[in-house]
């Protein structure tokens, strides 16, 4: 071998590479066109395929030259050093930054704040407070070295059994849009981005990677896309995450009608779209995703880079589509802290953020019932029943979980306000919690990966009449906590999850009988991210407080409400039905099915099972209160409901047209004896038109400041004229019918305080004709 010749060849190659790197443009905000021209096809393909999530099941080896920048982060984009293109880091959310708390060879801890879940945040009906939470989460995202937080969850609560409802805000798109907008604005004010998810109609977790969500264009536009649209137009999120599921037969991540025609052309979106963490699909060509407008494949397979290169060379993929997506990626990258060289500290102000958590979780809690039981005064000792009193759940399972340094349970929260718990009962429960957690870890099904991400629900223990009789004389009152857990990859069941278990029902009845016999109060705390059945047992207790999954300060927040330190002002953002089957969507929803058993996995593969392979949205526009209110169906607690320790008086509302905007105003007075906040919910009843419409629909809302007794505040709420529109499928347009619109101000959807009328002229707005259904569905109608 001629070693001299070989050495000269290697040296020449190295010199050429160095010269090429030196002459190559270095990315900045003003030379993106130049950088794209300088990129090789392989480099362009690399930029469209993410990586870094080495622990993702089935993801295979990630792009080899990447390293982990932030341990536990969800993924990264690829660096191209030759062109000055850095990697960027994305972390899971949205209830806090999901990263590893401990790092090999590092004695420091990297715990993040566990903030209230999405449902709890939305139940504040306080966009200023939600924006403040977003700012805190954005700060932790920044200081822990991440560029994008994967959240917020913008999907609707189509059905109370959806396992991921805890991450989502509401059954209503307006609540979703306004709360989501505030959250995004807060996060992005810190110089980091969000990835609003899951776009779109990710309405169930069962078979979520391939279920076909079949629905009308009207329901799609008015309900499932409306919140996203509001958030995109008002907050400009850096990224949108496309959903796993199909929409009318087409995968969302390869749906050009969704990702380009609607998102970009109709709404004017300028950011990037990235896939949910699916990797490579066997039944969806990669070129279809790129062409559709999916800019980033996450978490990415090395083979996908070559797939893009081959598709361009074979004529299956237009290089113009590749360049378009590359441009969007570069426009995203130059905004990131990592590109700008931000020196993150790894030390956000967790103490300050805990205070924000406590404030927001307290304001999001909803008082469902209060028969002179709250606030508690003069209580020294309570009997604390229910496993979750001692293992209070701060958040849900899966990617939405947060690795936290502590979580305040009910025992600690009560102790902090000077209320003791009966010692023997406390010892029994605390010992059981230790045992049950150890057993759960030992017996864990290896397929149930999500149990390592979050706090699993422990089984309830039976409380005998003898036990209750022993505890009653030692306590001034009883508090029972009923807990529920759910999360990514699984939906809830009716029996034992939506409904009480027999053990739980027996506990409530036995405790109530014993304590009421002695004239003592019984208070129930619901520690759940989702709706539960209450109608069968609510008459047996004196007070019910929905604490949701309120973040790390949960026990303290509950104590703040119980003592009256904070007056409850939370309102339900979803209907609490009498039974789960009262929702018309339940007929088409997955139920009584366990995705983590091999038998069911085999059944699943058959490919045409209702509720699993496809879900027909036959309820159409009648989701949540739109159904119950229009069809006059009784509910346990209506949408928008929530009690206070004080009373409020609503003045006569007024409504005025101001150009393309409509201003609604109402004066609210605190007529009670303690300070409090109240929500004004603005519902609109439309005149009859070509399309059947719900009896009334929420269009906006406002919340007062803390009003002292006798104090008043005038709320002014603004909406656009186009917000009154229904979607006209026949003409692919939004249409406001001419006529008189009734603006109804309520404290909930059933409790209307005043009405004002506004005459509105016809208005239309053309849209793309996208995502039409491919099968005939039997839509629910009030008048057939």
Functional labels for PLM-detected ranges:
Residues 732:
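Extracellular/periplasmic metallocenter environments
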Residues 751-767:
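Short beta-strand elements
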Residues 1-20:
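Gram-negative bacterial Sec-dependent N-terminal signal peptides
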Residues 13, 477-478, 754:
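Small side chains
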């Amino acid at each position: 071998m001629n070693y001299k010749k070989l050495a000269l060849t290697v040296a020449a190659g190295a010199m050429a590479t160095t010269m090429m790197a030196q002459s190559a443009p270095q990315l900045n905000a003003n030379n993106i066109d130049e950088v794209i021209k300088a990129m090789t096809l392989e480099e362009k393909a690399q930029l469209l395929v993410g990586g870094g999530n080495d622990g993702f099941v089935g993801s295979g080896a990630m792009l080899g030259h990447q390293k982990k920048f932030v341990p536990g982060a969800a993924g990264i984009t690829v660096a191209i050093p030759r062109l000055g293109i850095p990697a960027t880091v994305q972390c899971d959310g949205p209830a806090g930054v999901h990263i590893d708390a401990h790092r090999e060879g590092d004695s420091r801890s990297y715990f993040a704040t566990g903030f209230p879940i999405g449902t709890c945040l939305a139940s504040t009906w306080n966009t200023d407070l939600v924006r403040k939470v977003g700012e805190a989460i954005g700060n932790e995202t920044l200081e822990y070295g991440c560029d994008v937080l994967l959240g917020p969850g913008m999907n609707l609560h189509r059905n109370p059994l959806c396992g991921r409802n805890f991450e989502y805000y509401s059954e209503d798109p307006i609540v979703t849009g306004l709360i989501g907008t505030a959250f995004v604005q807060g996060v992005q004010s810190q110089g980091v981005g969000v990835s609003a998810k899951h776009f779109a109609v990710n309405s169930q977790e069962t078979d979520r990677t391939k279920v076909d969500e079949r629905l009308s264009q009207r329901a799609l536009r008015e309900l499932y896309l409306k919140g996203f649209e509001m958030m995109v137009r008002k907050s400009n999120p850096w990224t949108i995450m496309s959903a796993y599921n199909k929409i009318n037969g087409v995968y969302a991540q390869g749906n050009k009608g969704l990702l380009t025609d609607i998102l970009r052309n109709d709404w004017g979106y300028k950011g990037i779209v990235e896939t949910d963490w699916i990797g490579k699909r066997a039944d969806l060509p990669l070129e279809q995703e790129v062409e559709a407008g999916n800019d980033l494949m996450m978490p990415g397979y090395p083979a996908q880079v070559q797939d893009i290169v081959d598709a361009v060379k074979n004529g299956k993929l237009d290089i113009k589509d590749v360049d378009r997506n590359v441009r969007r990626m570069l426009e995203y990258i130059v905004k990131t802290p990592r590109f700008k060289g931000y020196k993150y500290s790894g030390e956000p102000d967790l103490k300050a953020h805990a205070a924000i958590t406590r404030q927001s979780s307290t304001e999001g809690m909803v008082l469902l019932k209060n028969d002179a039981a709250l606030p508690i005064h003069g209580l020294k000792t309570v009997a604390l029943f229910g496993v979750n009193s001692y293992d209070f759940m701060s958040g849900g399972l899966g990617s939405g979980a947060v690795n936290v340094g502590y979580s305040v349970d009910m025992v600690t929260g009560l102790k902090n306000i000077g209320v003791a718990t009966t010692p023997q009962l406390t010892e029994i429960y605390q010992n059981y919690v230790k045992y049950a957690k150890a057993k759960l870890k030992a017996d864990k099904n290896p397929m149930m990966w999500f149990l390592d991400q979050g706090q699993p629900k422990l089984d309830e223990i039976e409380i005998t009449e003898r036990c209750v009789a022993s505890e009653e004389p030692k306590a001034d009152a009883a508090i029972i906590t009923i807990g529920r857990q759910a999360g990514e990859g699984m939906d809830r069941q009716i029996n034992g999850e939506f409904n009480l278990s027999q053990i739980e029902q027996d506990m409530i009845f036995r405790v109530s009988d014993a304590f009421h016999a002695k004239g003592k109060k019984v208070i129930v705390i619901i520690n759940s991210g989702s709706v539960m059945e209450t109608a069968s047992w609510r008459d047996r207790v004196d007070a019910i407080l929905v604490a949701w999954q309120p973040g790390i300060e949960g026990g303290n927040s509950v104590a703040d409400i119980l003592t009256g330190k904070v007056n409850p002002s939370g309102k339900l953002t979803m209907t609490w039905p009498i039974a789960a089957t009262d929702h018309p969507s339940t007929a088409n929803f997955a139920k009584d099915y366990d995705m983590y058993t091999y038998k069911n996995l085999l059944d699943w593969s058959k490919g045409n099972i209702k509720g699993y392979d496809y879900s027909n949205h036959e309820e159409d526009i009648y989701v949540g209160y739109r159904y119950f209110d229009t069809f006059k169906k009784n509910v346990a607690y209506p949408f928008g409901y929530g009690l206070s320790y004080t009373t409020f008086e609503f003045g006569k509302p007024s409504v005025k047209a101001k150009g393309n905007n409509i201003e609604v105003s109402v004066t609210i007075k605190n007529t009670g004896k303690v300070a409090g906040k109240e929500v004004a919910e603005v519902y609109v009843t439309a005149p009859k038109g070509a399309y059947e419409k719900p009896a009334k629909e929420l269009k906006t809302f406002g919340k007062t400041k803390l009003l002292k007794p006798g104090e008043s505040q005038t709320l002014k709420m603004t909406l656009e004229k186009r917000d009154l529109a229904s979607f006209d499928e026949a003409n692919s347009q939004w249409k406001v019918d001419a006529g008189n619109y009734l603006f109804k101000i309520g404290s909930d959807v059933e409790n209307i305080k005043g009405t004002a009328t506004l005459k509105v002229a016809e208005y239309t707005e053309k849209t793309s004709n996208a995502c039409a259904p491919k099968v005939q569905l039997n839509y629910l109608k009030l008048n057939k």
